[in-house]
Every structure is written in structure tokens, then in C-alpha cells.
A protein has these predicted regions:
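Interaction-interface detector
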Residues: 1-85
Length: 85
């Protein structure tokens, strides 16, 4: 199974979905990403933003979760920053 994180315009993760490996040509990351993004856009809208994430291999540093932030320069996901009271 392949996991894809939907991002908002500020690169914050909105949701993570799972799609079958057949939808990404049974390829491994990074070759699988463009096929998965195309699949996600076909189902959620062409104006959506998607990045592949993985809890098995942990490419992009960590597995993306809701509220995580994608850093496009470093090409990683980071945990959300929690401000102290």
C-alpha cells in the first residue's frame, strides 16, 4: 500500500490516504510518487497538493500525520510546532 499526504497552501498536512500499489504501478518511491499524485488528483481534484509518505521506510524523515508540515527545501515532513503557554 502507498500513503499520500494532502497538503494545504501552507504545506500543512490535511489528511493521509492509502492507495493500492497497483495504482502506483507497483513501483517504489520515488518512481511511484507521480503516479500516486495523479491518482489522488483524479479523485480529490486537480487543484489539490499531494506528497508520498511512508511509515515503513520513513523517507522524508517521518511519516506524515495531520498537522505535520512539509518542508519543500529539505523534502521532509516535520512534526507540528507546539507553542508553549
Amino acid at each position: 500500500m502507498a500513503h499520500f499526504a494532502q497538503l494545504d497552501e501552507n504545506n500543512v498536512v490535511l489528511q493521509v490516504i492509502v492507495i493500492h500499489n497497483n495504482e502506483v504501478g507497483n513501483l517504489d518511491f520515488p518512481e511511484s510518487e507521480s503516479l500516486g499524485v495523479d491518482f489522488c488528483k483524479a479523485h480529490y481534484g486537480d487543484d489539490t497538493i499531494w506528497k508520498q509518505t511512508s511509515y515503513n521506510n520513513n523517507f522524508r524523515k517521518i511519516y506524515a500525520g495531520i498537522g505535520c508540515i512539509y518542508d519543500p527545501v529539505a523534502d521532509i515532513f516535520a512534526a507540528p510546532k507546539i507553542e508553549s503557554p
